[in-house]
């Protein structure tokens, strides 16, 4: 059994105890509470590059990357310098600014599906807005989403949502009326026949299909060959829209996201995380004829006080500039391959049933023989073993996502030496689970 007592976390424990009296569960987002892995959550003090430090002075190699945005590494000096310059001009205007144009052009140039874009403040907000847009453009009410795909915490999407909902063991959430989710149809991810059946049963009623093209909120699940293309063909056939939620995969699997990687272009795309460079941001965009429905150009209303604020735009612009440098994605892929293949090899040699994989700067490891093709497969994982593995790695200075149902992330700041240290820690932990 891996020790869970050697890591000094006295200050973290004290701060978390106080936090529980101030905030529900002591956190601002449920997965941070470590409910699915056991033990006390770590309270962080500062971050730099591939590393994080907690309030007790412990240092960790980080594979959470603030849940995806930190693809260039934490506190990248060029991003920080750009933000310092922007701060001198103010934190928010509540009015148009040139920086919005700059980031919009960069996003449009990068993402195949996006001809126009609207900036918002989070991935949840982007998905809420795109849902309204799907309905406004098609005049239809029903949507299809996939079990285990997470599109934020809006009521309509909290059906078989994976991610933090799966971590809590809840099928959805109290407080969501049945009438709100009545128009949300669900299918297993990677099951094209199930989607065909839903279209056949609901002709002329489905506004569109939304999915994570590579699932990161049931762990790490990749599409079967032909699945994404099959969805493209089905939505075309039925006059419905195809929406890729690339909040997690955008600019992480490749510069043009999953749609560039797999060669399938949706009608609309949601973005977040990376495009804000670590600041709160979201975006949705797509075909010009669809985006022209958005107010004030069209009748579909959506607004936001801090949308397009200069700090988020500045961090996003500098982050994308860094990602444009030659060799960036080859470097990310090599680091992630070294980590993912190393973890699988070590775990199997230690006698554990595992499966997993990687694309770009995103990876996953399941404690089940697999293959994992959908949410039901992911739920077969040995959650207790994952919890012990997570705690063991934490003891050895490696911070992984505190849930089996979350993907992991690498960054440009991770080195081959970091990966070797991680694999050495994993070998020790896995041999003693």
From Swiss-Prot:
Q: Which cofactor does it need?
A: pyridoxal 5'-phosphate
What's the family? Belongs to the class-III pyridoxal-phosphate-dependent aminotransferase family. HemL subfamily.
**Reactions catalysed according to its record:** (S)-4-amino-5-oxopentanoate = 5-aminolevulinate
Kindly list the positions at which N6-(pyridoxal phosphate)lysine occurs in this protein: 273
Identify the Pfam families for this entry: Aminotran_3 (PF00202)
User: Which gene carries the instructions for this protein?
Assistant: hemL
Pathway membership, UniProt: Porphyrin-containing compound metabolism; protoporphyrin-IX biosynthesis; 5-aminolevulinate from L-glutamyl-tRNA(Glu): step 2/2; Porphyrin-containing compound metabolism; chlorophyll biosynthesis
> Would the keyword Isomerase be found if you checked this record's keyword annotation?
yes
Q: Which UniProt keywords apply?
A: Chlorophyll biosynthesis, Cytoplasm, Isomerase, Porphyrin biosynthesis, Pyridoxal phosphate
Q: Species name for this entry?
A: Crocosphaera subtropica (strain ATCC 51142 / BH68) (Cyanothece sp. (strain ATCC 51142))
What EC designation does it have?
A: 5.4.3.8
Q: Where in the cell is it found?
A: Cytoplasm
Q: Please state the protein's primary subcellular location.
A: cytoplasm
- PROSITE patterns named among the record's database cross-references: AA_TRANSFER_CLASS_3
Q: What is this protein called?
A: Glutamate-1-semialdehyde 2,1-aminomutase
Enzyme class label? isomerase
GO terms for biological process, alphabetical: chlorophyll biosynthetic process; protoporphyrinogen IX biosynthetic process
The entry lists its GO molecular-function terms as: glutamate-1-semialdehyde 2,1-aminomutase activity; pyridoxal phosphate binding; transaminase activity
Q: Which domain of life is it from?
A: Bacteria
Oligomer and partners: Homodimer.
Gene Ontology cellular-component annotations = cytoplasm
């Amino acid at each position: 059994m891996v020790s869970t007592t050697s890591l000094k976390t006295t200050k973290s424990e004290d701060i978390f105890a106080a936090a529980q009296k101030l905030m529900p569960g002591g956190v601002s987002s449920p997965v941070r509470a470590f409910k699915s892995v056991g033990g006390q959550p770590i309270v962080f003090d500062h971050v730099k590059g591939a590393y994080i430090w907690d309030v007790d002075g412990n240092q960790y190699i980080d594979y959470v990357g603030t849940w995806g945005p930190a693809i260039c590494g934490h506190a990248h000096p060029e991003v920080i310098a750009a933000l310092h310059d922007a701060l001198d001009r103010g934190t928010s205007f509540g009015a148009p600014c040139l920086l919005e144009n700059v980031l919009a052009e960069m996003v449009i140039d990068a993402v195949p599906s996006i001809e126009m874009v609207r900036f918002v403040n989070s991935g949840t907000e982007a998905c809420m807005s795109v849902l309204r847009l799907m309905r406004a453009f098609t005049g239809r009410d029903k949507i299809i989403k996939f079990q285990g795909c997470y599109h934020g915490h809006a009521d309509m999407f909290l059906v078989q949502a994976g991610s933090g909902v799966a971590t809590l063991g809840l099928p959805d959430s109290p407080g969501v009326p049945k009438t709100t989710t009545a128009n949300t149809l669900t299918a297993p991810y990677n099951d094209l026949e199930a989607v065909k059946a839903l279209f056949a049963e609901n002709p002329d009623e489905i506004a569109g299909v939304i999915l994570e093209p590579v699932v990161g909120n049931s762990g790490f699940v990749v599409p079967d060959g032909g699945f994404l293309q099959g969805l493209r063909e089905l939505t075309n056939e039925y006059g419905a829209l195809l929406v890729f939620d690339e909040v997690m995969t955008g600019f992480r699997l490749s510069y043009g996201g999953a749609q560039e990687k797999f060669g399938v272009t949706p009608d609309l795309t949601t973005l977040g995380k990376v495009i804000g460079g670590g600041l709160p941001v979201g975006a949705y965009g797509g075909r010009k004829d669809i985006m022209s429905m958005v107010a004030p150009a069209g009748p579909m209303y959506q607004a936001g006080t801090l949308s397009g604020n200069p700090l988020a735009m500045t961090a996003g612009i500098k982050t994308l500039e860094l990602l444009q440098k030659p060799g960036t994605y080859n470097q990310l892929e090599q680091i992630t391959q070294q980590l993912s293949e190393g973890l699988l090899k070590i775990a199997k040699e230690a006698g554990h049933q595992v499966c997993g994989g990687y694309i770009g700067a995103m990876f996953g490891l399941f404690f089940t023989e697999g293959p994992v093709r959908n949410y039901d497969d992911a739920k077969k994982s040995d959650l207790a073993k994952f919890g012990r593995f997570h705690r063991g790695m934490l003891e050895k200075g490696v911070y992984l996502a505190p849930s089996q149902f979350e993907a992991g992330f690498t960054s440009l700041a991770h080195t081959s030496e970091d990966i070797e240290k991680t694999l050495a820690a994993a070998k020790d932990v896995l041999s003693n689970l």
